[in-house]
Amino acid sequence: APAVSLLYLSSSGDEVVESSVLNNSLLLDDIRIKIDNRAGRVILNSYYATTKKGNIEGLYSYIWDIATKKEMLTNSNRFTDAVRALVTNKRNLKDAFDMFYLDKVSTQSDGSFVVISEAAESYSNRTMFSRWDYFYGGAFYNPYMFYYWNRPFGFYPWARFGWGNPFMFNRWMNPYASFGYPSVTYNANNIALLSFDIKGNLQWVKTIDKKQTDQNVDQFIGYGTLENDKGMSFVYHQKQKGIHQLIVNTLTKDGQLTKSNSIILNEKNYEWMPKSLKQVGEQEAILPYQYKNKIGFAKIQIK
């Protein structure tokens, strides 16, 4: 397996510490880092396989102590069939996590943390994207951005250069979609919430069921989040029987997943961009939208 290291640079620039992430058997993919200032820790998470181009077998966690500048612990949580069944309705549970990509980590006051990921895939008239296309190269890698893993700059696996289509929002004009293919379908589906205790042991798994699809652009699928003292709210757009609405699910601090009243969007010819949502208050957020060939912003309130 390739070498992975965590590098620490002091604020003065005088001290550099390299900590090797020792792992001789797991193939890490889509590595993400979360700094937990409240607990004085750095948390590294990654889905892993045990064979090259194999199925995702579990989630690897590496926790580093900021005060001592040393590794605190590592943990590899192998997914059982019971866990896999919670995130998919497929009969074949082997590949249940193969289309899930890490998005963010929410840390809790007791030292536990919740890993959030979303199922994403793209199809063209010739082929389907595979997470292994860029294994070790990084489907998310953007050499021109330091924080390339932060949304909305580059979450989805098909975003080879940091985002899917930043300058062209019209579905009929996207010559670079899926690397030159004339027609591409983008899917953003279930959101998986995996909770781990302070030692990195898997405690529970919850799923937000959704199915979103679009042609040639990915700006109008996905979800946004708001965090406050009550928990984390997930906001995504859904169209059912001609009615556009924002669906809101909230993960409370005690681990309960609740569904709030939907926000009905009565405006016609508006297309909403929930994954670019920006929180501006405890319960308020700015939500970008496209109206014909114009970009605008709406303020929403999640109660």
Please tell me what each predicted stretch does:
Residues 154-170, 174-177, 195-239, 244:
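C-terminal structural cap/anchor segments
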Residues 45-58, 118-185:
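Short, conserved, GDST-rich strand-edge loop motifs in beta-rich repeat architectures
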Residues 19-32, 70-103, 204-224, 253-282:
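Conserved blade-ending motifs and adjacent loop-strand segments that build the rim/top face
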Residues 2-119, 125-130:
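Long, internal scaffold/assembly segments composed of regular secondary structure
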Residues 1, 40-52, 103, 111-123, ...:
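Short beta-strand elements that form the blades of beta-propeller/WD-repeat-like
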Residues 2-14, 56-71, 133-150, 177-201, ...:
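Beta-propeller blade signature
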Residues 2-3, 28-30, 188-190, 218-221, ...:
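Short, surface-exposed coil-to-beta transition loops
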Residues 56, 96, 125-129, 144, ...:
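Intrinsic-disorder/low-complexity signal
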